[in-house]
Amino acid sequence: MSGSYWTSMQRQKWQHTKPSLARERQRLWVMECQLFPQGLNIIVDSKPNSADSSNGNAANNGGGNGRSQLVATTKNIPITHRDLHYDKDYNLRIYCYFLIMKLGRRLNIRQYALATAHIYLSRFLLKASVREVNLYLLVTTCVYLACKVEECPQYIRTLVSEARSLWPEFIPPDPTKVTEFEFYLIEELQCYLIVHHPYKSMEQIVEALKEEPFKLTFTSDELQNCWSLINDSFINDVHLTYAPHIIAMACLFITVSIQGSNTKELSLTSAVTETLTSQSSLTPQQQTFFRFLAESHVDLEEVMDTIQQQIILYDHWDRYHEPWIKYLLHTLYLRPLSA
């Protein structure tokens, strides 16, 4: 346990470089290909071919309903496809984020605890595949353990009851299933449960900016935007690779860029690009923040990479398709054993 990120096990044991993270992901990829070479078979409704369609229409007209029938066919999703691979499937990443947030809001759990649950889930899914564990039970257990670590514990029966009300098909009524999974989770986390988050770093940076010579203050709306950006960043890998202050600085950079642009006409990508390229048209707030950024001696490459990952995330978010990922998980966990 450590009160400082710099001496914490989070930095010493769980902060990856990009190559080390890629090696962990490759190891999991190989394991998944060995354990689940058959991929996943799903049922897809499709329109019949022209010959079948004409026969079907004749039959339908005779029956008086006038409707063409859909044909159920089986489709195989190969194990090498990105679907259901946490590192490649942003649909799955965003869905996991919503699962944790949904359960947390039902129980009024503090954001710090939910952020810790996100980190636990990300670390666990470096070691295990969603194909071999119940994702909904994993989410419930991560929230349960995170609440204990962040000193806002939840009664396990209450937690399980709320989880069952959200996902009745996937959460067993027996609370001991969560406690059993908790031991499995702690083992995979190697008992390193203390997590340092960017929220505190953001508050420290904001306080530092209020002092001389910067005298820069943020409105409550700007701080809320930055807080929301940090929340969303847990979908990415940045919390596995960079220090909390790097993520906080990147989110403040995005906040300053957006506030200085016409957000009704510019996307996030355009706003950040405009800020980086149009030095002559920077607002006083942007100029002051960039001077602070330059004088703070943080790793600018890491800050820029975090910003880039956030932009990529929102690009994927625009194409997020929740019914598809829910259907895949439903098929994966609830299909007949003979399938």
Swiss-Prot record:
Entry-linked SMART domains: CYCLIN
Keywords (A to Z) from UniProt: Activator, Cyclin, Nucleus, Repressor, Transcription, Transcription regulation
All copies of domain Cyclin N-terminal, residue ranges: 93-194
Gene3D superfamilies to which the protein is assigned, alphabetical: Cyclin-like
Superkingdom to which the source organism belongs: Eukaryota
Location of region: Disordered: 48-67
Main location per the UniProt record: nucleus
InterPro entries, per the entry: Cyclin-like_dom, Cyclin-like_sf, Cyclin/Ssn8, Cyclin_N
One Pfam family from the record: Cyclin_N
Function: Component of the SRB8-11 complex. The SRB8-11 complex is a regulatory module of the Mediator complex which is itself involved in regulation of basal and activated RNA polymerase II-dependent transcription. The SRB8-11 complex may be involved in the transcriptional repression of a subset of genes regulated by Mediator. It may inhibit the association of the Mediator complex with RNA polymerase II to form the holoenzyme complex. The SRB8-11 complex phosphorylates the C-terminal domain (CTD) of the largest subunit of RNA polymerase II.
Subunit structure: Component of the SRB8-11 complex, a regulatory module of the Mediator complex.
Name the record gives this protein: RNA polymerase II holoenzyme cyclin-like subunit
Organism: Candida glabrata (strain ATCC 2001 / BCRC 20586 / JCM 3761 / NBRC 0622 / NRRL Y-65 / CBS 138)
Gene: SSN8
